[in-house]
Amino acid sequence: MAEITSAKAMARTVRVSPRKTRLVLDLIRGKNVADAIAILKFTPNKAARIVEKTLNSAVANAENNFGLEKANLVVSETFANEGPTMKRFRPRAKGSASPINKRTTHVTVVVEEK
């Protein structure tokens, strides 16, 4: 049986738009875990907090479930897929209304031993 060298964590239905989350994920893809966490700490963005939490969860999964070393881990894959959209309406003049889409995201972070 092949040895497991990667671990994954997901955050589902997070109240941040996927487009904004992808901007943050592009910053950390391919970096080692320590650098990625440092980058996320100094990114002034709601999505950065969520991605940081998910990354820490993936690292914990790697250490506890698969016995991998934190120092050897690299962020190999990150993606943000669209979750369910909450549809709301904003009242406008003359009895009309404009739609508001409150988007959610499914964030996935995969760490791999280099």
Curated annotation (Swiss-Prot):
PANTHER family assigned to the protein according to its UniProt record, in alphabetical order: CHLOROPLAST 50S RIBOSOMAL PROTEIN L22-RELATED (PTHR13501), LARGE RIBOSOMAL SUBUNIT PROTEIN UL22M (PTHR13501:SF8)
Family membership noted in the UniProt record: Belongs to the universal ribosomal protein uL22 family.
Stretches that traverse the bilayer: none
Function: This protein binds specifically to 23S rRNA; its binding is stimulated by other ribosomal proteins, e.g. L4, L17, and L20. It is important during the early stages of 50S assembly. It makes multiple contacts with different domains of the 23S rRNA in the assembled 50S subunit and ribosome. The globular domain of the protein is located near the polypeptide exit tunnel on the outside of the subunit, while an extended beta-hairpin is found that lines the wall of the exit tunnel in the center of the 70S ribosome.
GO cellular component entries: cytosolic large ribosomal subunit
GO biological process, any: translation
Identification of the protein by name: Large ribosomal subunit protein uL22
Secretion signal span: none
Gene: rplV
Gene Ontology terms for molecular function: rRNA binding; structural constituent of ribosome
Keywords, in A-Z order: Ribonucleoprotein, Ribosomal protein, RNA-binding, rRNA-binding
Domain of life: Bacteria
Database matches in InterPro entries: Ribosomal_uL22, Ribosomal_uL22_bac/chlpt-type, Ribosomal_uL22_bac/org-type, Ribosomal_uL22_CS, Ribosomal_uL22_sf
The organism's taxonomic lineage, starting at the top: Bacteria, Bacillati, Bacillota, Bacilli, Lactobacillales
The protein's assembly and partners: Part of the 50S ribosomal subunit.
NCBIfam families: rplV_bact
